[in-house]
């Protein structure tokens, strides 16, 4: 990494580790006077890697410079902003700063981890200031689908940066305060915002006249029109506003609210502690579902992205012991599809359709409302804040490019697309000179059970290969002179039926023996000199010969090669 930190010690630098060029994985770094600040540490979701649903950002840069980091600041509780903390914090051990609701949620979420007692989670009052030298931070309330979403105003002697987090302007939120436009306007009038770093996820939606209260009205109508069977609503688990909306809609239809999914229980517990839940709303435990008829229940379940460990997936696959889905039941997807999850979600749709249930989503009904701004709201934000520099983040390339174009149309002097790994120098004297000055290579990590694997790991590559083409195993027993003792042991998993396909086990054995013996002849050839002067070199050569032969056979017969596991065992 060719970055001289001393050279830029007095400069404001911005470095996104995740979320710029993709949806999710939000993790952004800010630098001034030799110190660094982390804003958010989220996960991303994937269906591309067998056995892996979640990926976390590459934090090698943080670890290499850990002595210069002052802490982690959290904007809000959504998984794409906090989900990586549980996997990465133990490597960093930095203090975490967040508002009361976010702090309580983090403590509850992380309580089951061994390092929970070590964690320092510090509560910050919203609309108040926090000093983490050399930074002075101000948490500014913005509306989102969860309460206490805070934009972070990062103040330095060289200029101030407004990191927006996820936001929208909503006049009648179901929960939480409205956006603090008064403070935003004040900042704009005073010319106090040098740069604004803002999300881009909803940039293509031009406008929206509806709010969560309007959604509540329509959900009441939808629920009342499906009277006979069970109603299951699946949402993003951390969307506490939607939990309240659905609970109120269920109550108006005379239904009790059931919950399936640990993460939902967690958010409800914290919301209850904060007195966010409306009076008269009671939640039915899973073990008590049998006490009610289906038409008396509305169940809120995890699984809106097709996750195979979720409550809805278990329902769809008859793995939920307390209640079953049947014809006449209704499933409502009160959520949007995160790019990349289409395959998993459509697979879930198909599984549910096998049960003849009715599926309702935002394509056929008004059952979801985004927590993100529309383009008109972004334009309003720029009129309020009037930044001299805009860095578009949190979105795929098309979102960032469109955000940059809109910001430019709004008269922002310098607009930049964020890109993971880019180190951007924010120039306070000449904002138009703000630019990328360097780049670090990043490799996200897959959350594989209890361990983290770099996405470029050979293990990930092998797993993909096995998933695509299966595995073909060959065990060869030899004596100390490498003479084969017995027929090779062969096993084919996920690619070939050795009993019924045209290439029989015996044929494979013959081909392997031929390749092996031909390899021995080449090894014994005097012309090869000292190329095979030790057993390791001999074994490596023989393995390559067998691999080459098997690869040719499979390519001719199947059109593709499986993952080969070939072992030579000396007896």
Language model features with spans:
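Conserved beta-strand scaffold positions in the cores of enzyme catalytic domains, especially
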Residues: 14-16, 121-123, 195-197, 331, ...
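Hard-cation-handling environments
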Residues: 204-334, 338-363, 367-532, 543
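C-terminal tails and terminal domains of large nucleic-acid-associated
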Residues: 535, 539-571
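Flexible, glycine/charged-enriched surface loops at secondary-structure junctions
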Residues: 195, 260-261, 362, 393, ...
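Short Gly/Ser/Thr- and Asp/Glu-enriched loop/turn motifs at secondary-structure junctions
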Residues: 125, 419-420, 560-564
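Short glycine-rich phosphate-binding loop at a beta-alpha junction
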Residues: 95, 391, 565-568
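His/Asp/Glu-rich metal-coordinating catalytic cores
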Residues: 2-73, 78-291, 310-324, 343-345
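Conserved hydrophobic residues forming the short capping helix/wall of the S-adenosyl-L-methionine
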Residues: 110, 407, 554
């Amino acid at each position: 990494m060719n970055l001289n930190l001393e050279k830029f010690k007095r400069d404001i630098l911005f470095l996104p580790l995740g979320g710029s060029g993709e949806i999710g994985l939000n993790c952004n770094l800010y630098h001034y006077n030799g110190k660094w600040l982390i804003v958010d540490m989220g996960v991303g979701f994937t269906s591309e890697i067998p056995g892996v649903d979640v990926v976390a950002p590459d934090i090698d840069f943080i670890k290499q410079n850990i002595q210069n980091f002052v802490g982690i600041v959290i904007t809000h509780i959504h998984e794409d902003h906090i989900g990586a903390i549980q996997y990465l914090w133990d490597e960093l051990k930095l203090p975490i700063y967040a508002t009361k609701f976010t702090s309580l949620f983090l403590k509850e979420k992380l309580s089951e981890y061994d390092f929970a007692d070590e964690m320092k989670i510090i509560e910050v009052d919203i609309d108040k200031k926090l000093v983490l030298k050399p930074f002075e931070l101000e948490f500014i309330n913005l509306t989102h689908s969860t309460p206490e979403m805070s934009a972070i105003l990062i103040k330095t002697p060289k200029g101030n940066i407004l990191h927006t987090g996820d936001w929208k302007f909503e006049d009648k939120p179901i929960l939480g305060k409205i956006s603090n436009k008064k403070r935003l306007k004040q900042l704009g009038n005073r010319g106090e915002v040098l740069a604004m770093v803002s999300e881009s996820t909803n940039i293509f939606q031009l406008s929206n006249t509806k709010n969560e209260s309007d959604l509540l009205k329509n959900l009441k109508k939808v629920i009342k029109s499906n009277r006979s069977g069970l109603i299951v609503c699946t949402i993003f688990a951390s969307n506490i506003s939607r939990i309240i909306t659905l609970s109120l809609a269920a109550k108006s239809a005379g239904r009790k609210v059931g919950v399936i999914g640990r993460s939902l229980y967690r958010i409800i517990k914290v919301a209850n502690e904060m007195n966010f839940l409306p009076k008269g709303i009671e939640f039915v435990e899973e073990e008590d579902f049998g006490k009610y008829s289906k038409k008396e229940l509305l169940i809120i379940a995890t699984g809106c992205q097709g996750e195979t460990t979720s409550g809805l997936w278990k329902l769809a696959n008859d793995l939920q012991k307390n209640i079953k889905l049947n014809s006449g039941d209704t499933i409502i997807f009160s959520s949007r599809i995160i790019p990349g999850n289409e395959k998993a979600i459509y697979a879930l749709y198909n599984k549910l359709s096998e049960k003849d249930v009715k599926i309702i989503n935002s394509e056929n009904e008004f059952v979801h409302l985004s927590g993100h701004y529309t383009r008109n709201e972004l334009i309003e934000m720029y009129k309020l804040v009037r930044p001299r520099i805009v860095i578009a983040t949190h979105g795929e390339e098309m979102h960032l490019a469109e955000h940059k174009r809109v910001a430019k149309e709004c008269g922002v002097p310098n607009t930049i697309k964020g890109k993971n790994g880019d180190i951007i120098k924010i120039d306070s004297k000449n904002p138009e000179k703000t630019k990328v000055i360097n780049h670090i290579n990043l490799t996200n990590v897959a959350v594989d059970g209890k361990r983290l694997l770099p996405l470029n790991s050979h293990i990930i590559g092998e797993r993909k290969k096995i998933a695509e083409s299966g595995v073909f195993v060959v065990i060869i027993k030899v004596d100390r002179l490498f003479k084969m003792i017995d027929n090779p042991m062969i096993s084919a998993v996920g690619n070939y039926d050795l009993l019924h396909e045209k290439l029989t086990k015996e044929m494979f054995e013959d081909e392997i023996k031929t390749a092996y013996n031909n390899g021995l002849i080449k090894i014994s050839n005097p012309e090869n000199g000292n190329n095979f002067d030790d057993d390791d070199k001999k074994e490596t050569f023989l393995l390559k010969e067998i691999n080459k032969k098997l690869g040719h056979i499979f390519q001719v017969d199947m059109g593709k090669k499986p993952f080969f596991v070939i072992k030579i065992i000396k007896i």
